[in-house]
């Protein structure tokens, strides 16, 4: 597989975050290598904070992918309503979605932030490959 084919595969979330992508070091891997080298390829344990951060990232940079998030209309994750819908899955609460959308709106109302994110020269979520050694 040549470099161009590898980069094409790494643009697919399932490949980037799966076994194929784990052949390569990402920025997250480098951080883990420095702070927790024995667990560099161990998946992060799901948490509400990580889920909300991922939703914010997606909301700003990849809004077409928001449909992958399950949203539950419940006040907390401890309610019967939440557990009935979510089961064992960690889901966004409707109030968290509202908060993230408000934060997105605030960020995009700022001319500097909006231009840095949506400017004509912006290109994000683009994997790269370099040889370290």
Predicted regions, residues:
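Metal-dependent nuclease catalytic cores that hydrolyze phosphodiester bonds in DNA/RNA
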Residues: 1-133
């Amino acid at each position: 597989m040549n470099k161009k084919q590898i980069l094409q595969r790494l643009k697919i979330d399932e490949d980037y975050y799966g076994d194929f992508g784990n052949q390569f070091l990402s920025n997250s891997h480098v951080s883990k290598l420095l702070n927790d080298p024995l667990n560099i390829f161990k998946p992060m344990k799901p948490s509400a904070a990580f889920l909300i951060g991922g939703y914010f990232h997606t909301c700003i940079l990849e809004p077409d992918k928001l449909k992958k998030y399950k949203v539950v209309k419940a006040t907390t994750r401890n309610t019967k309503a939440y557990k009935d819908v979510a089961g064992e899955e960690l889901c966004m609460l409707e109030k968290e979605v509202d908060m993230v959308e408000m934060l997105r709106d605030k960020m995009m109302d700022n001319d500097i932030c909006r231009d840095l994110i949506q400017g004509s020269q912006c290109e994000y979520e683009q994997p790269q490959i370099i040889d370290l050694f």
